[in-house]
Amino acid sequence: MVLLLSMISRCLILIILCYQRYISVFLSPRCRFYPTCSHYAVDALYTFGLLKGLLLIAKRILKCHPFHSGGLNSISIKTKSKREY
């Protein structure tokens, strides 16, 4: 089970990296946050694994609306814990 979740996490990271390299370059910069949502997603998946990473990604995307000011929102060292697959 752990191996399967790790493989899924790596596949998602690969998809996001392909998006960054081949699709994102044609879009104008729109992200309200630093790092961008795609960089945040890769960092969350790499640091926390699939389950907690997806939860953090969902929370980040839900913050992306005109009424949120954006700003610096990275995965801090304090929030890093053991990787949960």
From Swiss-Prot:
Chief site of localization: membrane
Keywords, sorted A to Z: Cell membrane, Membrane
Key word Nuclease present: no
Pfam annotation, one family: YidD
Subcellular location field: Cell membrane
Taxonomic superkingdom: Bacteria
GO cellular component terms attached to this protein's record: plasma membrane
Membrane topology: Peripheral membrane protein
Family matches, as InterPro entries: Membr_insert_effic_factor_YidD
Listed PANTHER family: MEMBRANE PROTEIN INSERTION EFFICIENCY FACTOR-RELATED (PTHR33383:SF1)
Record's function text: Could be involved in insertion of integral membrane proteins into the membrane.
Entries under HAMAP family matching the protein: UPF0161_YidD
Record family assignment: Belongs to the UPF0161 family.
NCBIfam families reported for this sequence: membrane protein insertion efficiency factor YidD (TIGR00278)
The name this protein goes by in its record: Putative membrane protein insertion efficiency factor
Organism: Buchnera aphidicola subsp. Baizongia pistaciae (strain Bp)
